[in-house]
Amino acid sequence: MSTDITPSSAPQCPDHIVFEHVTKEFRTRSGTVRALDDVSLAIKRGSISAVIGHSGAGKSTLVRLINGLETPTRGRVLVDGTDVSQLSDKAMRPLRADIGMIFQQFNLFGSRTIYDNVAYPLKLAHWKKADEKKRITELLSFVGLTSKAWDHPDQLSGGQKQRVGIARALATKPSILLADESTSALDPETTADVLSLLKRVNAELGVTVVVITHEMEVVRSIAQQVSVLAAGHLVESGSARQVFAHPQSETTQRFLATIIGQHPNGEEQARLQSENPHARLVDVSSVASHSFGDALARISHTGASFQIVHGGVIEVHDGSLGNYTVALSGPAQAVEQAVQILEEVSNSAAPTTSATVPTPTEEAH
């Protein structure tokens, strides 16, 4: 048995996980609850994909469909091209062994050492003792906890406990890692450390990472692809840069407002206009700080004057994103030319996919 730290080989479908028109309903005493409604979503192999939504959006149900703990009421969930719901109990075991998972509350065995916590899935998989020891040593080194091998969980910080959880989840060399609200119980600094480790898992081991969260800061820090759930509906999906630059749904816009200033509302716009009575105000969304800077340099040659009166910038996975309001003044022709330059910047990112969300009749899980 090989003991290198990389995940086991698997059929190389470009889309690692696919939801095809998936609806999931639960029967309750009060009636039928629709947790997911006609969700179609593809997660690419080797990516870091985030699924974000508020409580009740259907995130937990989506995770349980991936590892076969739930089956769709309608539609299909494919992992490596295989319909999960069609697998027998025997065929389900290797699929679940190929999917690691970490949780908000760590789920460690308090009475066992860190070494034995990481060893647990290897013992279930009947690894040879020598291979088991080598694998655990590799993993504890990878997550930076070699010196903690014989400690118990109550001797560790929250961030260290989550590192143990990651090591244990990677023990059997899965090709998929599901992180279900894995940083919700951590402080911001520790969250950043754990997210950095998840990036390494993806970059160095080639593992497809699926992050389930309600925190847009987590999405901003780590995600390459973003999908937004609202009351069981997929309301938006696209690259992180696309979703952040051009949010299509109201849900996404509210999430983004928690980490980056949005364009001014009507009242703020009126105030800015009163402060700049002779200027034309233009809202700009830029997916790269240099493109906005280049635009301002071009405007300086038009004869128009400009001033940034509102906005800010954040870093996302593959670049930066800024929302700005620019006050333009000067000769009418120069101002018009400057407006066109700024519009080119705002139109430079492709729109995300989105859908109109019908009013749900039941609350999703």
UniProtKB/Swiss-Prot annotation:
Membrane-spanning residues: none
Residues engaged in binding ATP: G53, H54, S55, G56, A57, G58, K59, S60
Catalytic activity: L-methionine(out) + ATP + H2O = L-methionine(in) + ADP + phosphate + H(+); D-methionine(out) + ATP + H2O = D-methionine(in) + ADP + phosphate + H(+)
InterPro entries: AAA+_ATPase, ABC_transporter-like_ATP-bd, ABC_transporter-like_CS, MetN_ABC, MetN_ABC_transporter-like, P-loop_NTPase
Pfam families per the UniProt record, alphabetical: ABC_tran
Molecular function as annotated in GO: ABC-type D-methionine transporter activity; ATP binding; ATP hydrolysis activity
Localization of this protein: Cell membrane
Disordered as annotated region, ranges: 346-365
Keywords of this entry: Amino-acid transport, ATP-binding, Cell membrane, Membrane, Nucleotide-binding, Translocase, Transport
Ribosomal protein keyword on record: no
GO annotation, cellular component aspect: plasma membrane
Residue stretches making up the ABC transporter domain: 17-256
SUPFAM superfamilies for this protein: P-loop containing nucleoside triphosphate hydrolases
Subunit comment: The complex is composed of two ATP-binding proteins (MetN), two transmembrane proteins (MetI) and a solute-binding protein (MetQ).
Protein name per its UniProtKB record: Methionine import ATP-binding protein MetN
Name of the gene encoding the protein in the UniProt record: metN
